[in-house]
Amino acid sequence: MWSWRRAIGRILVRSSRTCLALGVLLVLAGCAGPVSEDARVRPGSFGPGSQEAAAADVAAYAFADAARTSGQPAAAARAVAAVEYLAARLHDRSRTTAVPAAAVPAGDRDDLLLARGRLRAALGIGATVASQTMLDGLLAAADDLAAGDQAGARAALPPPGFPPDIIERLGALPYIWQVNAAAKTIQDDLTRFGDAGR
């Protein structure tokens, strides 16, 4: 009688250990944040030439002064998309980009991820929204807003991924020093890389 009870006890202990190990792995996976993914844009989305360099120029200019996006949701949408694009493209070195890893120090890439998080928080956008979803929506909205099509812009940024007042939030972005600093640093990194290649 005791032998089968011991066998059942061993099975239960092993099952508990397995569940605990799985639980730890799930917690660690959650702490790591959303899985990074590829981020693609059409040529010329941020300007001519390399889209990484063009995006850095857009972001550095827009976020240096809140007045440059205040009341201008189209400009804000493109600038936020620029930060999103740079964070996704430069942080995951497994993807192919025109920019080698050595051109942008790891610390600068980490600061860019922090800046992306600050922007998402200011806009009421969750960390789980995919980078490609952000890019597609923001760039389409920027084009619609520039053409005066606010209804089209809202349709490009639908809930639940984006808050209902996303257009208003874009037009009232506060100055966020982490975003300004990260954008300027990345611009400097890419400028040095470009100069070195000439």
What are these regions (language model features)?
Residues 2-20:
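Bacterial N-terminal signal peptides that target proteins for export
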Residues 27-30:
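C-terminal motif of bacterial Sec signal peptides marking the signal peptidase cleavage site
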Residues 39-65:
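Post-signal peptide N-terminal segment of mature Sec-exported envelope proteins
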Residues 19, 49-52, 165-166:
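Secondary-structure junction/capping motif
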Residues 32-35:
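Bacterial signal peptide processing site
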Residues 60-198:
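Mature extracellular/secreted ectodomains of secretory-pathway proteins
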